[in-house]
């Protein structure tokens, strides 16, 4: 079956499907609508699925690893088109992904799930400010961390970086310690590694 056949069939099966939009999106991605779907590369199969999904008029859009197999340019294009789509027609979009930093600026709420358990759920801004790192001499870092909610400590050659939940404790800090925010990707990794 060819890509344009898929587009035509989707229009028959889904009342809210916009075939014109699908063709515009296919063109934006340089997806050959005359190509057989079985001959498409992994990336272009993903693009074909995204074109179909973004052309549906649905209140909820669920995307599981939507950029799997896409190169960096196509991933950026997808995120741009997803935002344009949302601005034209606001709806709930759920994205399951391991490429957290790529979607960090697109999302309003984040749920971190590990092995079926919800570890954290909050607005993206709340999650961004929920963790931090402290680095310095290992002995100073260990002393700082005593009694705090430590996710993990990376240590190498007498220097350590600790990842913690909460906000820096100014009373514990000294001029030998540095603090920094933890991005969502690092927070996800450290939360899901905890206890391993």
Regions found by a protein language model. Name each.
Residues 78-164:
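ABC transporter nucleotide-binding domain
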Residues 152, 156-196:
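C-terminal coupling/interaction segments
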Residues 57:
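Conserved catalytic motifs of ABC-family nucleotide-binding domains
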Residues 61-65, 70:
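Catalytic Walker B motif of ABC-type/P-loop ATPase nucleotide-binding domains
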Residues 72-74:
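Helix N-cap at the start of a conserved alpha-helix in ABC-type nucleotide-binding domains
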Residues 1-48:
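ABC-family P-loop ATPase nucleotide-binding domains
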Residues 4-5, 76, 80:
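Surface-exposed alpha-helical interface segments used for non-catalytic interactions
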């Amino acid at each position: 079956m060819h890509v344009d056949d898929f587009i035509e069939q989707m229009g028959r099966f889904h009342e809210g499907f916009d075939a014109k939009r699908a063709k515009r999106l296919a063109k934006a991605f340089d997806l050959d609508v005359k190509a057989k779907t079985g001959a498409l590369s992994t990336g272009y199969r993903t693009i074909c699925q995204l074109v179909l999904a973004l052309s549906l008029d649905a209140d909820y859009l669920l995307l599981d690893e939507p950029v799997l197999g896409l190169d960096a340019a196509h991933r950026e294009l997808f995120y741009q088109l997803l935002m344009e789509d949302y601005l034209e027609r606001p709806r709930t979009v759920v994205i399951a992904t391991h490429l957290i930093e790529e979607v960090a600026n697109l999302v309003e709420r984040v749920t971190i799930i590990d092995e079926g358990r919800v570890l954290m759920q909050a607005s993206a801004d709340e999650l961004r400010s929920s963790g931090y790192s402290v680095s310095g001499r290992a002995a100073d870092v260990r002393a700082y961390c005593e009694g705090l909610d430590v996710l993990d400590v990376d240590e190498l050659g007498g220097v350590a970086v600790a990842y913690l939940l909460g906000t820096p404790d100014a009373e514990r800090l000294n001029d030998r310690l540095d603090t920094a925010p933890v991005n969502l990707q690092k927070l996800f990794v450290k939360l899901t590694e905890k206890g391993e």
